């Protein structure tokens, strides 16, 4: 079997099929030969899919750094209708109900999914098919997808803003771990200390984190999670409470955005709809809402703990 983008399939590779429902859909694991077609598919909605596209550009289609496996769903016309990364963080972009159902059905076979994240309507459709046999939901957050393509006004210099290095790890790691715990309910320093430290050190070596450190104290940080020519995805933005209300957080963020726009068409990020302070900060920095995402955190299966 050969698909329109050059991906080949055989009986061993076909993981899920809707042929019995006359939909003719086929779900296949993705390999390096599909990279160009997948990136083209994802680029049709660049800010919604920047995380997956960035992982592929950074790590390739198959890599332990992805912490999961990429799959593609083809319809009966051999057209790609969906791409998913299924694993620790499960992300997907689907253009049909059949693709969502295929991804959700396959995801039930995983024991260690920590997060499911996509646009809210897609996540709820995914959970409809996943709930019978999947891991239980720990909790979820609705998030605003913010985006800007304009460099914000920068009133003042920020000579103190710089790229973080591994020498900053001891300052950043506890802060980032607490952010993860507050968001997911899991403290990564308790559940996977060495892995968490190793992954964040890799990010620092990739020059993906901006910081302001003064007097041995972290004042501000922002992480570049994914980068493509079309979009850059920011996450992990943290502001020391002792600079709140000074305008310096806005100044730091504005300079980060300005620098990143030199190599990407737009900057995007997610923030919880209930985080009023963050929403106001991003709006002041020139970001505007492009939709609602949902992040669903799952509890581990009971048998995975034994």
How should each PLM-predicted stretch be described?
Residues 97-106, 235-241, 245-261, 279-284:
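Conserved acetyl-CoA-binding loop-helix of GNAT-fold acetyltransferases
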Residues 121-139, 250, 274-291:
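Conserved active-site alpha-helix within GNAT-family acetyltransferase domains
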Residues 23-30, 40, 46, 53-115, ...:
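Conserved donor-binding loop and adjoining core beta-sheet/short helix segment
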Residues 117-123, 241, 269-280, 295-305:
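Conserved beta-strand-loop-alpha-helix junction that forms the acyl-donor binding cleft
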Residues 111-119, 231, 260-271:
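Conserved GNAT acetyl-CoA-binding A-motif
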Residues 57, 86-87, 188-237:
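A conserved beta-strand-loop-helix scaffold within acyl/acetyltransferase catalytic domains
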Residues 2-17, 75-79, 87-159, 296:
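Acyl-donor-binding surface of acyltransferase catalytic domains
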Residues 3-52, 151-189, 306:
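Short amphipathic alpha-helix that is part of the acyltransferase structural core
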């Amino acid at each position: 079997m050969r698909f329109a983008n050059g991906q080949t399939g055989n009986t061993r590779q076909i993981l899920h099929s809707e042929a019995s429902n006359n939909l003719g859909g086929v779900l296949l694991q993705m390999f390096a030969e599909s990279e160009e077609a997948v990136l083209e598919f994802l680029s049709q909605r660049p800010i919604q899919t920047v995380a997956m596209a960035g992982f592929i550009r950074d790590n390739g289609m198959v890599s332990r750094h992805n912490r999961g496996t990429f799959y593609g769903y083809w319809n009966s016309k051999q057209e790609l209708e969906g791409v998913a990364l299924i694993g620790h963080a499960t992300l997907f972009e689907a253009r049909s109900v059949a693709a969502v159902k295929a991804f959700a059905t396959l995801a039930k076979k995983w024991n260690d999914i920590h997060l499911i994240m996509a646009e809210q309507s897609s996540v709820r459709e995914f959970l409809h098919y996943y709930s019978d046999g999947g891991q239980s939901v720990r909790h979820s957050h609705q998030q605003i997808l913010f985006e800007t393509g304009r460099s914000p006004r920068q009133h003042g210099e920020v000579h103190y803003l710089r790229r973080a290095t591994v020498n900053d790890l001891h300052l950043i790691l506890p802060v980032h771990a607490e952010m993860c715990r507050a968001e997911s309910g899991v403290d990564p320093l308790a559940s996977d200390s060495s892995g968490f430290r190793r992954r964040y050190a890799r990010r620092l070596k990739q020059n993906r984190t901006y910081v302001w450190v003064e007097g041995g104290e972290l004042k501000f940080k922002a992480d570049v999670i994914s980068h493509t020519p079309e979009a850059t995805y920011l996450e992990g933005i943290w502001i020391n409470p002792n600079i709140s209300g000074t305008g310096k957080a806005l100044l730091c963020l504005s300079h980060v955005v300005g620098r990143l726009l030199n190599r990407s068409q737009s900057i995007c990020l997610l923030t919880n709809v209930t985080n009023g302070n963050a929403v106001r900060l991003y709006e002041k920095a020139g970001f505007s809402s492009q939709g609602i995402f949902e992040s669903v955190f799952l509890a581990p299966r009971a048998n995975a703990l034994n």
